[in-house]
């Protein structure tokens, strides 16, 4: 198994990743006989709920594999809850393989802007003690302690 992500390759506990983000590119070097899970934020999300997070780095791969290959702009594989999470990168699909009915949303600049994403993330973060701010048009959201 090869799990690659901008914040974590794999999550396994029953924790919650809250208000996190990744902006770096993720490059997946495929192993010929391995299963592959790669995403802009997390490769294999097996146990952590995700709340108000985003990813913007491009996700690319080199090589090939005879195993399964699940790559998404936000998550490679997902087995838990995703709430108010967003991505903006080279992928049309946010989650490569999704066992839950929740989904991340793509910021396309037209239907979904960063301001709309920040508003939704802040609604989800009402009791978390932090808030996202979108102050400069064209820039990325920043996190601020309340």
Please provide the spans of the model-predicted regions:
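Predominantly extracellular beta-rich ligand-binding scaffolds that present long acidic/polar faces
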Residues: 1-146
């Amino acid at each position: 198994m090869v799990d690659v992500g901008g914040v974590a390759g794999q999550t396994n506990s029953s924790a919650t990743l809250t208000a996190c983000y990744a902006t770096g590119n993720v490059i997946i070097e495929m192993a010929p006989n391995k299963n592959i899970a790669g995403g802009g934020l997390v490769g294999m999300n097996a146990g952590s709920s995700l709340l108000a997070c985003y990813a913007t780095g491009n996700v690319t791969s080199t090589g090939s594999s005879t195993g399964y290959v699940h790559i998404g702009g936000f998550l490679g594989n997902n087995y838990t809850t995703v709430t108010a999470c967003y991505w903006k990168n080279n992928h049309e699909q946010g989650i490569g393989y999704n066992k839950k009915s929740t989904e991340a949303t793509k910021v396309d600049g037209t239907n979904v802007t960063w301001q709309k994403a920040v508003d939704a993330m802040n609604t989800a973060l009402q009791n978390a003690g932090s808030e996202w701010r979108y102050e400069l048009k064209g820039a990325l959201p920043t996190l601020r302690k309340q």
